[in-house]
Structures are given as structure tokens and as C-alpha cells.
Amino acid sequence: MNDCLDLESYDNIVICPSNPFLSIDPIIKIQELNDFLLKHKERVYVVSPIVANNSLKGPTAKIMQSLNIDVNVLSVAKHYREVASNIVIDSSDKHYIQNIQSLEINCLVSEHLVMRSDNDKVNLANDILKFLNA
């Protein structure tokens, strides 16, 4: 990894709501990063790219279907459970909280996961900061 990147200096890691299969997995499979995430998964927060059983953007839902994976936030939590202990989900997916918590993953709920404006993006960022500082 980059010598200038000191992973230990970060209090938390946030995995943004991007495609887990095409965008995130290739990055978190880098050995040094993967080892760090496995060791410090309590400091890792995933923002779900799935809301109300659909992709926020892009082909995530289609890829999940092609892999015979249920398109929901529970599947996202299962996908990341080895490297993350926290997931941010949309309020429309609150009915999954108990199932997600049974995976020993903290579930944080935001009203702002669907970002249609810059203001929505700022609100989501503020929600995540509140979760990180709780």
C-alpha cells in the first residue's frame, strides 16, 4: 500500500454506497487493507447501496439477482460482515434491523440515504458523522 497512508491513524472507515461487487470488493481485497479491516471491523461503517430492495444507482441489484442474492440490506450486511460491524440503512428498511443485528452488526438508520440533491448529500454526511461520534 501507499507508504503515506497510515491506516492506524484513522478513527473510523466509511465504505460509501457504491457497488460492492464492481467497486468496493476489488479495493478491500488488497491484502494490507483487508487485514486492517478484519482486525478493526468495529471501526468500519458501510453505507448501504440498496434501499427498499433496489439499487441507489447502477447495476448492484442486477448483479445481486444474477448471483442469486436477495436484493435487500440484509444481503448487503451479510456481504460485508467479515470486515464491518456497522451498517447505515435507509428508514424504509427498518424492518431488517433485527435480522441485521443477529449478524452482530450495528444498524444505524438514516432518513437521507436517497440523495436527490446536494442538500440530501449533506444531510446524509451529517447523519454519518453523528453515528461516528455517538
How does the language model describe each region?
Residues 1-7:
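Active-site glycine-rich loop that binds ribose-phosphate moieties when present
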Residues 9-23:
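Short acidic, glycine-rich surface-loop motifs adjacent to enzyme active sites
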Residues 11-14, 43, 86:
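Structural motif
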Residues 18-22, 52, 93:
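Short glycine-rich anion-binding loops that position phosphate/pyrophosphate groups of nucleotides
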Residues 26-35:
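Charged helix-capping and loop-helix junction motifs
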Residues 35-41, 81-83:
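Short, conserved loop/helix-junction motifs that constitute active-site signature segments
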Residues 40-57, 112-116:
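Short, flexible loop segments at boundaries between secondary-structure elements
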Residues 57-134:
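C-terminal functional extensions of proteins
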